């Protein structure tokens, strides 16, 4: 393989120019993130009274919608619907750089559309902050980054574990495992940072509301967590040829 061919393979030019399904994949990422953000932030709207949102309700809404979408779109694009997941999969060479970049753009546009729909469909006195994620005022931005990196690490690590194509021991539902990791992250960290775990999820409402406070935290934290999860899984835990398929209990 020539140096030029090697660079093209790493970047993934053929994934864009020769893959007939690339547009289906990008539309799937757009729609998946659209539904994630619209359904997810819909659960945070401040209706008040008996319909006031609770932490448990929000946590399970985000977890269940991701599990559902993974079943619906997983066979088309892998249903990343999260730049941190996409970047984590870049680290393990499961997706090329160029294809990953196109995925991330589709995810961000879908997130904006999802947030815009909820704003348009919700009474103005209920919208509140439109689910814009924010750091507890008692925390520093650095602490917010650490929390977001932590909970996103768990999410992306689970994605790698259940999507490892050399494993043959997975007996449960991979989408459910991913969804529950998101629910767990929310239950743990909503009070800290709003538990974004997903730059696109924070980006969409921020664009629609024009609220950029600490937005960088919701990019740096999840991306760092995704990169670390991808690197750790690839270095220490990815099933390789000749390895035992699973731990023998």
UniProtKB/Swiss-Prot annotation:
It is found in: Membrane. The keyword Transmembrane helix applies. Residues 1-26, 79-100, 160-169, 233-249 are cytoplasmic. One of its GO terms (cellular component) is plasma membrane. Signal peptide: none annotated. Belongs to the MIP/aquaporin (TC 1.A.8) family. CDD domains: MIP (cd00333). Localized in tracheolar cells associated with the Malpighian tubules. InterPro entries: Aquaporin-like (IPR023271), Aquaporin_transptr (IPR034294), MIP (IPR000425), MIP_CS (IPR022357). The keyword Repeat applies. It is a multi-pass membrane protein. It comes from Aedes aegypti (Yellowfever mosquito). PROSITE patterns: MIP. The chain crosses the membrane at residues 27-47, 58-78, 101-121, 139-159, 170-190, 212-232. This is Aquaporin AQPAe.a. Homotetramer. A motif (NPA 1) lies at residues 82-84. Forms a water-specific channel. One of its GO terms (molecular function) is channel activity. Residues 48-57, 122-138, 191-211 are extracellular. Aquaporins contain two tandem repeats each containing three membrane-spanning domains and a pore-forming loop with the signature motif Asn-Pro-Ala (NPA).
